[in-house]
């Protein structure tokens, strides 16, 4: 089922003609209709809904009621609308579903009108235009999923969870999202719309996909499951540097690095309970008669290590870290999108044991700042992402100053999602979300304070009196999945490209940092000498020794976003200098090679290094994409 929900000043319709041979019988009174101050729900019932119409009705009513509460609507207009899908259900099934939705909404106390089914209708609608005024929902019955495999927490959330959305300013003002003035905060507006609509389906290819293919970084792998990618040498270099960078930052912060298995037993008592808190989207592996699932995070392995460890209050906060290569999650095929949403991904995952809420909140703030620092290092500033903070109403009342301080640290308004009661294992969570060129958002950094899993897994520490206590646990990924960081970097550069600016990777991440171009074969030896000096200084350099004309060689380097282009001819060889084109500012300068080495070293100081991923000479390189 597809639904388009519009909060409107009014919706009115008038029947014009039959759209089906046997439409729903109607009276003269039903040929026209109008409701004011209404939530208009345009619905396409789909073929897949025929598998379990009753389930679809229940889910649809829950979604409609959720939105109605958010926009404070007491009137609902159910409007059959075939144009939201190309895979429609049989007319008799669709009509029955629509009637039951109408009936159940009336039972809940709403004033409901339903437009006739099977007719062409003229309609007028006045949308209110606030951030919650236009939302979409997709509902799919869980055909073939046995009762015991269904996700307990997810079912509960669908029935009971109601989110209240606000914008919190750095000054501490909490404003209902539909009353906030988004002027000057267009990216936040896009994020709010995406977050509330919950539409994860990718209907177009995001620009980063074109860039990852053009630059021969990453590609789809037809020999594997969808959402499992292949990395060419340049892409593997970028990914490897990011993995090393985040790991170094987390270890520097004080985490102990561990390694744990990628698969776990479905029947392990603690894991079975934990799985019930997550959607049933695991890869399943069988070994003999036993069934295992591939991990979707490092939680399992780290929790089991902590369970077996003897931990004193003197050891707290205790930070443990693993870079999972890989974590797995069987996302729906329609949600898969380049590097943004995958089925196999690399997740930097730190878990911190804290003795009490005070220590946990202190760590939370430190890890919030750590996440900002990590993203800044990959070229993403607070202007490039939006913040969401999630908690219960009680937590807000008890910790307002702490939450406001988070908004002050980031220096701009943030999205707040608040609940009346806690449905999840955490009491506080934040994410830094990147909004891409298709107005889709993806969570990067995140930290959560977990109040359930210590007891669930039997993780304890000994306090000052020698008594065993259950700690709190913080889940932290300071960057988010490495693939998503690559996605965000490429999408940011695509935005700059669309604005007529020169895109480029951060210098420390550029697969080739310097390209040396000899004007002729006569100076190839000097070009190789220059390249040797740069390589000796741990700078990634290559030499264009192809037969292309000089202008074409320069254009080729520009197209590859090479930060420094050195053109060498007889003058440079005789004077032992280099002529350098800087991509960053577009300037061309003549300088000593030592000065260029010093400049690059200064700009890459503090970041990891890996050697050139491809042969030195361009003529020796294979082409990975036709």
From Swiss-Prot:
According to UniProt, the name of this protein is Threonine--tRNA ligase
Cofactor binding mode, per the note? Binds 1 zinc ion per subunit.
SUPFAM superfamilies in the record: Class II aaRS ABD-related (SSF52954), Class II aaRS and biotin synthetases (SSF55681)
Class of this enzyme: ligase
Where in or outside the cell it occurs: the entry states: Cytoplasm
Source species of the chain = Thermococcus gammatolerans (strain DSM 15229 / JCM 11827 / EJ3)
Q: Which positions bind Zn(2+)?
A: 299, 351, 475
What Gene Ontology biological process does one annotation of this record name?
threonyl-tRNA aminoacylation
Q: Where is this region: Editing domain?
A: 1-144
One family from Pfam that matches here is HGTP_anticodon
Q: From the Swiss-Prot or TrEMBL record, what is one GO molecular function term?
A: ATP binding
Q: Quick one: where is this thing mainly located?
A: cytoplasm
**What's the stated role of this polypeptide?**
Catalyzes the attachment of threonine to tRNA(Thr) in a two-step reaction: L-threonine is first activated by ATP to form Thr-AMP and then transferred to the acceptor end of tRNA(Thr). Also edits incorrectly charged L-seryl-tRNA(Thr).
Q: Which family does it belong to?
A: Belongs to the class-II aminoacyl-tRNA synthetase family.
The EC number(s) attached to this protein equal 6.1.1.3
């Amino acid at each position: 089922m597809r639904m388009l929900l519009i909060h409107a000043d009014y919706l009115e319709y008038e029947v014009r003609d039959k759209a089906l041979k046997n439409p729903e019988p109607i009276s003269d009174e039903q040929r026209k209709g109008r409701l004011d101050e209404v939530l208009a729900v345009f619905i396409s019932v789909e073929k897949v809904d025929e598998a379990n119409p009753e389930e679809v009705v229940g889910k649809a009513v829950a979604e409609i009621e959720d939105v109605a509460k958010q926009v404070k609507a007491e009137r609902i207009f159910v409007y059959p609308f075939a144009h939201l899908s190309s895979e429609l259900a049989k007319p008799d099934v669709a009509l029955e579903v629509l009637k039951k939705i109408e009936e159940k909404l009336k039972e809940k106390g709403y004033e409901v009108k339903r437009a006739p089914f099977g007719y062409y209708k003229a309609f007028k609608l006045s949308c209110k235009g606030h951030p919650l005024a236009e939302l979409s929902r997709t509902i799919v019955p869980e055909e073939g999923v046995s009762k015991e495999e269904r996700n307990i927490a997810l079912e509960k959330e669908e029935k009971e969870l109601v989110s209240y959305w606000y914008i919190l300013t750095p000054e501490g003002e909490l404003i209902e999202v539909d009353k906030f003035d988004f002027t000057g905060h267009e990216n936040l507006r896009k994020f709010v719309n995406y977050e509330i609509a919950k539409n994860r389906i990718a209907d177009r290819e995001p620009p980063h996909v074109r860039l990852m293919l053009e630059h021969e970084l990453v590609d789809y792998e037809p020999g594997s499951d969808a959402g499992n990618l292949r990395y060419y040498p340049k892409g593997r270099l970028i990914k490897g540097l990011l993995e090393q960078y985040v790991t170094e930052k987390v270890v520097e912060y004080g985490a102990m690095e561990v390694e744990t298995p990628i698969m776990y037993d479905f029947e392990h008592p603690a894991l079975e309970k934990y799985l019930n808190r997550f959607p049933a989207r695991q890869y399943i592996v069988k070994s003999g008669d036993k069934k295992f699932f591939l991990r979707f995070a490092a939680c399992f392995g780290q929790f089991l290590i902590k369970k077996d460890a003897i931990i004193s209050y003197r050891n707290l906060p205790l930070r443990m870290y693993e870079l999972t290569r890989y974590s797995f999650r069987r996302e729906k095929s329609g949600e898969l999108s380049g590097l943004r949403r995958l089925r196999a991904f690399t997740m930097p995952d730190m878990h911190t044991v804290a003795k009490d809420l005070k220590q946990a909140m202190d760590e939370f703030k430190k890890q919030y700042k750590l996440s900002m620092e990590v993203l800044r290092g990959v070229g993403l500033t607070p202007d490039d992402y939006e913040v969401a903070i999630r908690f219960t109403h009680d937590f807000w009342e008890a910790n307002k100053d702490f939450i406001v301080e988070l908004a002050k640290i980031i220096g701009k308004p943030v999205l707040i999602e608040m609940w009346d009661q806690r449905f999840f294992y955490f009491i506080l969570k934040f994410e830094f979300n990147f909004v891409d060129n298709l107005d889709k958002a993806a969570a990067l950094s995140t930290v959560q304070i977990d109040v359930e899993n210590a007891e669930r897994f039997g993780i304890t520490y000994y306090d000052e009196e020698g008594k065993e206590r259950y700690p709190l646990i913080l889940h932290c990924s300071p960057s988010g999945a490495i693939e998503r960081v690559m996605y965000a970097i490429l999408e940011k550069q695509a935005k700059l490209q669309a604005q007529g600016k020169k895109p480029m990777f951060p210098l420390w991440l550029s697969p080739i940092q310097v390209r040396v171009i000899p004007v002729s074969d006569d100076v190839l030896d000097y070009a190789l000498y220059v390249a040797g000096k740069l390589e000796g200084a741990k700078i990634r350099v290559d030499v264009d020794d192809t037969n292309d004309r000089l202008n074409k060689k320069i254009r080729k380097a520009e197209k590859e976003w090479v930060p420094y282009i050195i053109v060498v001819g007889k003058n440079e060889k005789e004077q032992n200098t280099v002529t350098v084109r800087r991509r960053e500012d577009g300037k061309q300068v003549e300088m000593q090679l030592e000065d260029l080495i010093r400049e690059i070293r200064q700009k890459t100081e503090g970041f990891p290094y890996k050697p050139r991923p491809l042969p030195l000479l361009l003529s020796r390189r294979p082409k990975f994409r036709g």
